[in-house]
Amino acid sequence: MDILLANPRGFCAGVDRAISIVESALEKFGAPIYVRHEVVHNRYVVNKLKEAGAVFVEELDEVPDDSIVIFSAHGVAKTVREMAKSRALKVFDATCPLVTKVHMEVHRASRKGSEAVLIGHAGHPEVIGTMGQYENREGGMYLVETPDDVARLKVKNPDDLCFVTQTTLSVDETSDVIDALRKQFPKIQGPRKDDICYATQNRQDAVREMAGLVDVMLVVGSRNSSNSNRLRELAEKVGSKAYLIDDASMIETVWLEGVKAIGVTAGASAPDVLVQNVIARLRELGGNMVVEHPGREENVVFEVPPELRII
């Protein structure tokens, strides 16, 4: 059984930055450091940071006065920032810069009074944060997930409307919804550049290229990771059996029966150590040659805040 590794896979620049912010804050200020929501959606990463002294909370009222709090990579609503400011909490913002770009687009629409549509999954932290950038009561902010949602959408002024997308969705998902929006609202304006992030796009492209070469695709990532779920769905859509696993212990031998080639990739919030453990386990189960599939090289780096840079 050959093992094919997707390239690129695993950590993106936004995740790397978010984790570095928490680690640097712990190193500089000591524990506890409070983090609003899981800094990234990966159980292994979160548990490691907990062991180092990070305390994960869902709301700021769980954070004691005079504490340091970090906002997760998914971003937060304006009301959360305002609450942190009113309590004089020391804040470090680990919001991915690509999510911040979407926030700025929504803020501009709100300021102008244009209505805005967000393509995203209800309840996802990034979606909650992005929806929370719109404050204009005279306008409107709407969430859609499918073309059917678009068909039911009623807006106040279809001539002054824009859309943005959740960064971790699949390109296939958003294209259908965008087509529906443009058909129903011919004057709708989109972002100057696609909101789907480079890492999401690259990892999806790698899976799309590999899926036809393997019998089974393993996606390393947590179940609450949006981009990891999209990778599994994409592999299945292209025609490969696919499984989302937190780690090597979740591999079931029945998946490998009759398999000549197996693919391995990882969501943008999954560390490489988990991938290496999966490879080791596959070798124990009969895997031999490990081949890294050619893909797009990534050299994007997002800097941590100056105050947290360790010299």
From Swiss-Prot:
Q: Which GO terms describe its biological process?
A: dimethylallyl diphosphate biosynthetic process; isopentenyl diphosphate biosynthetic process, methylerythritol 4-phosphate pathway; terpenoid biosynthetic process
State its Enzyme Commission number(s): 1.17.7.4
> Which cofactors, by name?
[4Fe-4S] cluster
| Top EC class, one word | oxidoreductase
Q: What is this protein called?
A: 4-hydroxy-3-methylbut-2-enyl diphosphate reductase
Q: In which pathway does it act?
A: Isoprenoid biosynthesis; dimethylallyl diphosphate biosynthesis; dimethylallyl diphosphate from (2E)-4-hydroxy-3-methylbutenyl diphosphate: step 1/1; Isoprenoid biosynthesis; isopentenyl diphosphate biosynthesis via DXP pathway; isopentenyl diphosphate from 1-deoxy-D-xylulose 5-phosphate: step 6/6
What keywords would UniProt list here?
4Fe-4S, Iron, Iron-sulfur, Isoprene biosynthesis, Metal-binding, Oxidoreductase
Q: How is the cofactor bound?
A: Binds 1 [4Fe-4S] cluster per subunit.
Show the InterPro entries listed in the entry: LytB/IspH (IPR003451)
Going by the entry's taxonomy, the superkingdom of the source organism is recorded as: Bacteria
Q: Which CDD domains match?
A: lytB_ispH (cd13944)
Q: Where does dimethylallyl diphosphate bind?
A: 41, 74, 124, 225-227, 269
What residues does isopentenyl diphosphate bind to?
A: 41, 74, 124, 225-227, 269
